Amino acid sequence: MIRPCDMITVAMARLIRDGDTVFHGVSSHMPMIATLLAKRLHAPNAVHLNIPGGVDPEKPVLRAYTSAGSELWDSACAVFPLMDVFDLSMRGGLDVAFLSGVQFDRQGRVNASVIGDYHRPKVRLPGGAGSAVLIPTARRA
């Protein structure tokens, strides 16, 4: 049975072009799988950057609670720290950034802070972390 999350992951993989530099954040299971799928099927020269700082990990492990496990760094062919990802993106070198969000409007703006009134929210979210830098500077986010 094909699940909606499988279809979304395949659609995300299709967005990655051969030679793209691709970054995903924390708890980004579908983007991590999409990046690995794209590298195996049609984009072998895509560069996989991840939040622990690993580049093209050889033995990625999908954990239930995070996509930022140490094996993404331990088995990487190189290390590229998170602060360098921001710099790369601001210089125009980041092709794809997969970032999470809870609410999106028609213009693509992301809400990752609160649902409801800011001072008395129904739900308080973790925040956007680097989204404010990466969304406007990555070629595709």
PLM feature spans:
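N-terminal active-site beta-alpha-beta segment that forms phosphate/nucleotide-binding
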Residues: M1-S75
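Conserved phosphate- and dinucleotide-binding cores of soluble alpha/beta proteins
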Residues: L62-A141
